[in-house]
Curated annotation (Swiss-Prot):
Organism: Tolumonas auensis (strain DSM 9187 / NBRC 110442 / TA 4)
Name of the protein this chain belongs to: 4-hydroxybenzoate octaprenyltransferase
Cell compartment(s), UniProt: Cell inner membrane
Main location: membrane
GO MF terms held by the record: 4-hydroxybenzoate polyprenyltransferase activity
Transmembrane segment boundaries: 22-42, 45-65, 90-110, 113-133, 142-162, 169-189, 212-232, 236-256, 265-285
């Protein structure tokens, strides 16, 4: 794919992670969960288009501001040393301008929605902007990331029904907990490097109890999603999707059993299938 991108645009492409769609997908699935549940299985095409485009744009913006914040650290981490900023292929000023451009595009998209959702979008922007800096001040940056990755859920409910329901916040919490679980796996990949440079994470905080805490978070995710199914009176196909998701969580636990970098990263990537399965269950159950 990179071979067809003009050389001068390749650093921007990589900065926005357009060559690595996993983050976009992990943000997209809960957004689709919310749109389908809020609209009783019949979301409007215009809302689908706006929110899907918004996911792509804001995920890219989040990656850009993350790399800007980490530009002085990424060169010391094996996985991130080749990124455009630490590698010197793009300046910090250009990265900031690119971030502002993406935020402007996101603002144009959200401006098509109702006033309540526009107000809610401010919270999402703030979370996306502050998350990268949380790794310096707290051992729980994954909580802030989870909030940022869940913020499209109240926005979806705001756009569809104009209010935030009990299901809205249960779904928000379920996705928050799930995000902490899978991003802890992601942080396990960099744990040794992060310890050397002073970057904090739940992987470091949990230490040798990391697998236990991830398992508890995964159990919490499934429990909250099951409660949502009961509240929304979803059919058995939804619960079957949760059962399959539980199977994937067990597989992820097996992958991370030795805490090897590649295996932890594979476990992280596997969460894409979790999100897709739950979405399929919601689609069939609504």
């Amino acid at each position: 794919m990179m071979s067809v991108i003009p050389a001068q645009w390749q650093p921007y492409w990589q900065l926005a992670r357009l060559d690595k769609p996993i983050g976009t997908l992990l943000l997209l699935w809960p957004t689709l969960w919310a749109l389908w549940l809020a609209s009783a299985g019949v979301p409007s095409f215009s809302l689908l288009l706006i929110f899907t485009a918004g996911v792509f744009v804001m995920r890219s913006a989040g990656c850009v501001i993350n790399d800007y914040a980490d530009r002085k650290f990424d060169g010391y981490v094996k996985r991130t040393a080749s990124r455009p900023l630490p590698a010197g292929r793009l300046t910090a000023v250009r990265a900031l301008l690119f971030f502002l451009l993406l935020v402007l595009i996101a603002f144009v998209l959200v401006w098509q929605l109702n006033q309540f959702t526009i107000y809610l979008s401010v919270g999402g922007l703030l979370l996306a902007a502050i998350y990268p800096f949380m790794k310096r001040v707290t051992s729980l940056p994954q909580v802030v990331l989870g909030m940022a990755f869940s913020w499209a859920i109240p926005m979806a409910y705001g756009a569809v029904v104009g209010q935030l329901t009990v299901t809205t916040w249960l779904l928000f919490l379920a996705n928050l907990v799930w995000t902490i679980a899978y991003d802890t796996m992601y942080a396990m990949v960099d744990r040794d490097d992060d310890l050397k440079i002073g970057v904090k994470s739940t992987a470091i905080l949990f230490g040798q109890n990391d697998r236990l805490y991830i398992a508890l978070l995964q159990l919490g995710t499934l429990t909250l999603l099951a409660i949502i199914g009961w509240l929304e009176q979803l059919t058995v196909s939804y619960y079957f999707s949760l059962l399959l998701a539980a199977g994937l969580f067990i597989y992820q636990q097996w992958l991370i059993r030795h805490r090897q970098r590649d295996a932890c990263f594979r476990a992280f990537l596997n969460n894409n299938w979790v999100g897709m399965l739950i979405f399929a269950g919601i689609m069939l159950a609504c």
